[in-house]
Amino acid sequence: MPLKFETYHPQGLVRVDDRYFMTSVEVTSAPVKCDPACDGYDRTPGAGIGHLFEFDAKGTLLHDLHLGSGTVYHPGGFDYDGRYLWVPVAEYRPNSRATVYRIDPVTFSAVPFLQVPDHIGGVVHDTANNRFVGMNWGSRTFYVWGPSGQPQRKVANPEQFVDFQDCHYLPAGKAVCGGVASLTVGSTPVQLGGLSLLDLRTLDAVNTVPMTGLTPAGNSVTRNPVWLSTDRGALTLQVVPDDDQSVLYTYRAG
């Protein structure tokens, strides 16, 4: 389904009944790599606008909420717990900083919930254990916060298959995470996608499935926004892999 609006660089996706919510980053000035490091970072912060889009089942834009402040403008993968959307917005560079917002999907009221001294690219609300799990740039590190945002754990991610881009809570303390690994085979660049079932207590991947499908633009189908659900006995995967003039792809099995 073509989306009937400028999507910029999509990041995360949630479906609520017949509506969709999607985060995206609009870069107005791209970060520039620094060598040597600039102010302790490997690149400049750049500039941009964070978006939380709401659109309907026909791809028509209903709302566009701007998120972030100053150099914090990069929304990531996000979660919905039946009441609120939990959306991280970070600087567009590793080892930086982020704000996690609690957003009412009806009123679009956005309240800063948590400040983190790192780039947070995804958040899951673990309702079974009454806590939040986040991941940093490339999902190399997991963070665990209590119900009020108090830090509880910081753990290296043992999963080396793909960098998680978008994760969502599943009942009984699990999460499904989609992501991509950008590889070079010989001299050929390759995007290898994947889906992982994550145990939110141990933070280990219970199962991981490679996803080799590519869009006509050459992007892995799990490159960024991923939404997985069961629909009338079928497993449904919905993804938005491409930038700017994007298409929502739907795959069903079962």
Q: What residues fall within each predicted segment?
A:
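Beta-strand-rich domains and repeat architectures in extracellular enzymes and scaffolds
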Residues: 2-41, 74-77, 245
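Short, conserved, GDST-rich strand-edge loop motifs in beta-rich repeat architectures
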Residues: 23-47, 90-94, 179-193, 247-251
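Blade-level signature of beta-propeller repeat domains, shared across WD40, Kelch, NHL, RCC1
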Residues: 221-254
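Short coil/turn segments that connect the beta-strands within blades of beta-propeller domains
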Residues: 17-19, 82-83, 128-130, 172-174, ...
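Beta-propeller blade signature
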Residues: 37-58, 98-106, 190-203, 250-254
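Loop/turn-rich, solvent-exposed surfaces of beta-rich toroidal or solenoidal domains
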Residues: 159-204
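A short beta-strand motif characteristic of beta-propeller blades
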Residues: 1-3, 60-68, 109-114, 150-157, ...
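Repeated scaffold domains used in trafficking and secretory/extracellular systems
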Residues: 7-12, 70-79, 116-127, 160-169, ...
